[in-house]
């Protein structure tokens, strides 16, 4: 399947791609350009940035509230929006899909993935690490 990479930011991060015979997909980057914080399927990057301008700062530093997450999705009803929150240098801590349902990721003292929980705080998956001497 062919994909056209339409645009990049000044740090070389992909900001928009279009699958063959498909709709554009915008990627918004945060945490000083280190991590993708939103994938918006169905509109261009320029339109996404324009429509989300009031939320970009909070989205880019991971401080968007649950209420703001919902409002963000209502701004662009024609698009499917997935958002990501990170603990820098560790990993993703929350992924919220287009349906508004979140998965939360927790890490142990050594920054290894420990659990994945749903938005009702129910454990979906646990990880154990065993080392052999």
Q: Residue locations for each model-derived region?
A:
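Beta-strand elements of repeat-based all-beta scaffolds
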Residues: 1-19, 23-97, 102-133
């Amino acid at each position: 399947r062919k994909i056209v990479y339409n645009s990049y930011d000044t740090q070389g991060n992909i900001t928009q791609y279009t699958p063959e015979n498909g709709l554009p997909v915008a990627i918004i980057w945060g945490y000083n350009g280190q991590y993708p914080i939103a994938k918006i399927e169905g509109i261009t990057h320029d339109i996404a940035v324009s429509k989300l301008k009031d939320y970009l700062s909070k989205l880019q530093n991971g401080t968007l509230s649950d209420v703001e997450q919902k409002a963000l999705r209502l701004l662009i009803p024609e698009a499917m929006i997935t958002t990501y929150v990170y603990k820098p240098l560790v990993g993703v801590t929350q992924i919220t899909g287009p349906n508004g349902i979140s998965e939360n990721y927790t890490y142990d003292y050594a920054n290894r993935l420990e659990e994945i929980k749903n938005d009702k705080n129910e454990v979906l998956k646990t990880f154990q690490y065993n080392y052999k001497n």
